Structure formats: structure tokens, C-alpha cells
Amino acid sequence: VYQGKALVNSVTGEDERLEIILPMVKKHGAAVVAISNDESGISEDPDVRFSIAKKIVERAADHGIPRGDVVVDPLVMPVGAINQAGCQALSIIRRLREELGVNTTCGASNFSFGLPNRNGLNSSFLAMAIGAGLTSAITNPLHDEVVSAVLGANVVMGLDPNCADWIGKFREPASDAGGRGRRGRRRGRRR
């Protein structure tokens, strides 16, 4: 039982799976997370992963599923194992947004797997990924570094009108106003 729209996770580019899952997604008015791998596994080549994502998006459209209901996971790889993993992920995310106009998601902590100071790396990656067009991420909202990076990236990208979320998270009214709070500060200026 759920409220809103169901989200079917991990639909890969395997033809057999697409023909089974996509009709069910359409029938139930669900959205789908498209995973950028197929029968051959996960390619390290970002062009191959993009092509698989494009195939899934096109196949979904053939079944009447709108692009807005397809969220692509470009499969972020660990930078400790693949030196160019960050550049590859950012390239794919940018192309998915610009060329296909789809929403994206990723397991953000995959990027830092096996490395120290994972929150620091994940924060840097997330800020850059948002800049490239990432629209959602699976991450730990309890890590302050990650939250700061996401909120900051949203400010930089113009996704936080009037910096409302940033201010709501970080403003300390009493300290910003010399201990008088917001109202005290305003009154102090009018005297």
C-alpha cells in the first residue's frame, strides 16, 4: 500500500525484462528507475551506459510511459577503483539531462566506496553532480557535510529561490543580530 505514485526500481536495459516490466509500469501508472546496464553487465564506457539509458527511455515511451516518469540511474562507480568514475558519471548525468530531458538519481555513496572520509568525497561529488543535472540521490540525510553540499549546490544552481532552504537551515537569528534576534535587529535599524 502506498500513497502517490509507485516507483518501480532497477529496470535494466535487458530486452526480456523491459517487455515484462514496462507494460506493468504503464498499467499501474507507476514511474520507473532505469538502470544503465544490460545483458553485458555494467560498462565502464560512459557512452555505452548512456546508450542503454536512452534505449530504456525510448522503450518506455513506446509503452506510453512519459519521460517524466522515467528516472535514470547512470550507475556511479567507485572512484577508488576507476580513476575517471567521477568524470564519467558527471558526463552521463549531463547528457541525460540535456539530450533526453529525464530525471536522474544515483547511489551517491558508491562514489567513495573503499576510501577514507567518505562524507567529504560524497559531498563534493553530489555538489558537482547537481551542477551537471542530477535531480535526486540516494544518500544519508543525517550527514551534515552532505546536507550542506546539496543545499549549497541548490543555491548555486538557482534551485533555492531567495536562498530560503539555505537560510532556513543555517541562519541563527540571535547571533546574526548581535544577540537581539530578527525583530530586535529591525527595530535597532529604525532608531
Residue spans of the language-model regions?
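Catalytic alpha/beta core domains of metabolic enzymes, predominantly
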Residues: 5, 20, 25-178
